[in-house]
Amino acid sequence: VPKAGGPLYLYRLLAERPHDALLRALDFSGAPALPEVHRSPAQIEAARQFRQWAQDNGQSDLVALCNRYAEQSQGGTTRLLNGPTGERNSYSLLPRDHVLCLAAEERDLQAQLAAVMAVGSEAVVAESAVSNALLGKLPPAVQKRITRIADWTSDTARFDFVLHHGHPDQLRDGSQHLARRS
């Protein structure tokens, strides 16, 4: 008899899976009700303003990405799952608090920010000409959910997760640096 969360893990065994695999697993889990959503007004407003900013600036690809992330995001949700013997289990998906966004191109940074805002995390962005130009144009609610740092490699830089867009050599170097962090 499978455990209550079993269907959620089966998709991890596939070499390729549908983009909405988690949503399918949650829908077929026998959950009796819609999930409880635990997001602050600031999280909700930042995601809304980021999408609106993209729309106001004619960035239809970014708007579509924001919509897709919003539809698929399960960050901050709790679902009740029925167990094999009538027990009830809760399954919560909580976003990482601080997500380091590493991108050399503005378009890549925008995609990262769309993901971070959709799940309800706060972005940590290394200062650069590209990031400074973009961040200065963003709405206030979005800017409040972004921390700028001069040097992400500093031991004082605080983040829980990393999103990287860039050259494989940069990824390798960044991964080695992250592995050395205490």
Language-model region placement:
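C-terminal segments
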Residues: 1-102, 106-112, 119-182
